[in-house]
Amino acid sequence: MANPIKIGIGGPVGAGKTQLIEKVVKRLSKEMSIGVITNDIYTKEDEKILVNSGVLPESRIIGVETGGCPHTAIREDASMNFAAIDELLERHDDIELIFIESGGDNLAATFSPELVDFSIYIIDVAQGEKIPRKGGQGMIKSDFFIINKTDLAPYVGASLEQMAEDTKVFRGKRPFTFTNLKTDEGLDEVIDWIERDTLLKGLS
């Protein structure tokens, strides 16, 4: 496929970006050809995690070492990621969907619209109930927003109801969901959004 759909996955360090990709790819790779690009500052740790998980052959996963601000590599100067896309397509010209995981960054990080067609931004409950209230372009402008690790809410004193209300204030009608990726809670909602809104399944 000459022009695969590209979905960016952004969010702070430890929010669950790599785990989200692992879970989603495990489901979707049964029915379509997928590639993954990971961004890390000085290592290829996330690439190794995905390779070791076995969700895709190693040749379908490329790790990019950004060597600086991870935000720059997905927006102002995305040349390394464009090169990785080209390399993936040289290896597998049938790829229909590419996930591009950003390095862990702040709430302001967004993807260049030239690099990705859609973006998902993920945070986790342990970062605090106030995070959705802070806004941030990553959360506000992403096509889909995820609040992960709902199981931790009682331990950090976070109200999921309040987080939902604050999210609606900043995102309006843009979709979001809660997840506990450890148990796959909420994963169906993420898959449904990808299939319906990015792959346009069920539309005719």
Swiss-Prot record:
Localization annotation:
Cytoplasm
Q: Which PANTHER family match?
A: UREASE ACCESSORY PROTEIN G (PTHR31715:SF0)
Keyword check for Nucleotide-binding: yes
Q: Which GO terms describe its cellular component?
A: cytoplasm
Where does the protein principally reside? cytoplasm
Protein's name according to its UniProt entry? Urease accessory protein UreG
Organism equals: Staphylococcus aureus (strain MSSA476)
Q: Tell me the GO molecular function terms.
A: GTP binding; GTPase activity; nickel cation binding
Which family does the similarity line name?
Answer: Belongs to the SIMIBI class G3E GTPase family. UreG subfamily.
Q: Which residue ranges traverse the bilayer? A: none
Q: Report residues binding GTP.
A: 11-18
| Family annotation (Pfam families) | cobW
- SUPFAM superfamilies per the record? P-loop containing nucleoside triphosphate hydrolases
Which InterPro entries does the entry link to? CobW/HypB/UreG_nucleotide-bd, P-loop_NTPase, UreG
Keywords assigned by UniProt?
Chaperone, Cytoplasm, GTP-binding, Nickel insertion, Nucleotide-binding
Taxonomic classification, please? Bacteria, Bacillati, Bacillota, Bacilli, Bacillales
The entry describes its oligomerization and partners as: Homodimer. UreD, UreF and UreG form a complex that acts as a GTP-hydrolysis-dependent molecular chaperone, activating the urease apoprotein by helping to assemble the nickel containing metallocenter of UreC. The UreE protein probably delivers the nickel.
Q: Which NCBIfam families match?
A: ureG
Q: What does this protein do?
A: Facilitates the functional incorporation of the urease nickel metallocenter. This process requires GTP hydrolysis, probably effectuated by UreG.
What is one Gene Ontology biological process annotated in the Swiss-Prot or TrEMBL record? Answer: urea catabolic process
Chaperone recorded as keyword: yes
